[in-house]
Amino acid sequence: MNLALFDLDHTLLSGDSDFEWAQFLIEQGVLDREVYEARNQTFFDQYKNGTLDIREFLAFQLKPLSRHPRRVLDGWHHQFMQKKILPILRPRARELVERHRGDLCAIVTATNSFVTAPIAREFGIDHLIATEPAHAGGEFTGEVTGTPCFREGKFTRLVDWLALRGVSLASFAQSWFYSDSLNDLPLLSRVTHPVAVDPDDTLRAHAEKHHWQIISLQ
């Protein structure tokens, strides 16, 4: 069996699921637009530049989850999927995932699993490696549990996940990772088939230098 790994935001989706979740909450009147959008833009700029402090960002990202009961969040998420995610789900991304049926497939994303688990199911991908929000008594605490699934943390989390299955990356004759971002270089550099998907300029330059495949799902 081969291994196929997919980044989510700006790879399988034409947008960012965490950003869209925040926009949804703003539209629900849950978050203050002016305050939240200014901070979110700062974090996004840092992400693009490869300078994001993931712990600082996650404290910001996960705080809204701790303010509302899980049953309310789940209800909002159903609306969020219909309103925000389905419109940015790339048809060509569905086709790409279908081409890997029969491989061991997983989405590997820095965005938290509350936001992304239903999206993985929408793609028909059974396995999700994501940043895990901590919870107590069934409710989110606003904290993170385990290693954030970001930069080198994506590779760390993948190694741990494979170990639970009794295998390692070397167990697969072929492995793919599809991503748009320079932040994913630590994992891209470790698979046999790194694929840059509609990449940012830095990743495109790296991919061209190392003769990696570059594709578009737009």
Where are these regions (language model features)?
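Alpha-helical substrate-recognition element adjacent to the catalytic core
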Residues: 1-3, 8-132, 141
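C-terminal cap/substrate-recognition subdomain and adjoining C-terminal extension
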Residues: 1, 75, 82-218
